[in-house]
């Protein structure tokens, strides 16, 4: 971790997942040639999963045209450290964790999906460093397991022939981000009801920029050490 802002530095959040035991953790880095903000907007766009990872992904794997379960219900909520999105699809119900818990879009550039974090770190206006922190629980027969170090490796975005890799969920996301151009032209977009989370996030960014310009502290800054304790 590196902090490059003004002093005093805020606390690094001690998210619960950082303390999970009996698992293997690794960090995967990839350089993505587009602006970081369009990457982060993808974090609060649940319906892209249906089309990118299920419909298109299924066709990539099998060659067959098979459509995944359609989204029936969506909700977006803001909380102290970001936003959550919640969904019900044709193959789930409101008892499913996808609705009761949802997924977490961490402010300002993170995403938590239950077993891994993703961060979109700006390199410059047209390039982003994708950082994935992935936890995998070891088999029960291997417990207790203590990991002594966390390996870090670079994940390629193109194969040896220069073709974009599209066989993994993260790489499919990279394609969606880069396909919008180096900097997405939002003057040509057509937002719909499923984009309410994107709209809410954009509004919050403008509000927080105004707050900082006026000398205030932005959203999700943590300074109280007594609050910076993982949920047991």
Predicted regions and their residues:
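C-terminal catalytic domain of Rieske-type non-heme iron oxygenases
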Residues: 1-232
């Amino acid at each position: 971790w590196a902090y490059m802002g003004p002093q005093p530095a805020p606390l690094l959040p001690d998210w619960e997942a950082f303390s999970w035991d009996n698992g293997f953790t690794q960090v995967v880095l990839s350089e993505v040639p587009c602006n970081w903000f369009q990457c982060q907007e993808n974090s609060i766009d649940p319906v892209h999963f249906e089309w990118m990872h299920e419909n298109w992904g299924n066709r990539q794997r099998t060659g067959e045209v098979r459509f995944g379960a359609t989204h029936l219900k969506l909700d977006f909520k803001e909380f102290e450290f970001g936003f959550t999105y919640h969904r019900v699809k044709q193959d789930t119900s409101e008892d499913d964790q996808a609705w009761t818990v949802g997924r977490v879009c961490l402010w300002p550039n993170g995403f938590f999906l239950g077993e891994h974090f993703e961060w979109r770190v700006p390199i410059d206006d047209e390039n982003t460093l994708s950082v994935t922190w992935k936890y995998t629980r070891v088999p029960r027969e291997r417990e207790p397991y203590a990991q002594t170090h966390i390996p870090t490796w670079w994940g390629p975005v193109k194969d040896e022939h220069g073709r974009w890799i599209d066989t993994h969920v993260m790489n499919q996301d990279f394609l969606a981000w880069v396909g919008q151009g180096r900097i997405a032209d939002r003057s040509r977009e057509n937002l719909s009801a499923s984009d309410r989370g994107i709209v809410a996030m954009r509004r919050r960014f403008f509000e927080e920029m105004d707050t900082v310009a006026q000398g205030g502290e932005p959203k999700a800054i943590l300074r109280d050490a007594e609050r910076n304790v993982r949920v047991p």
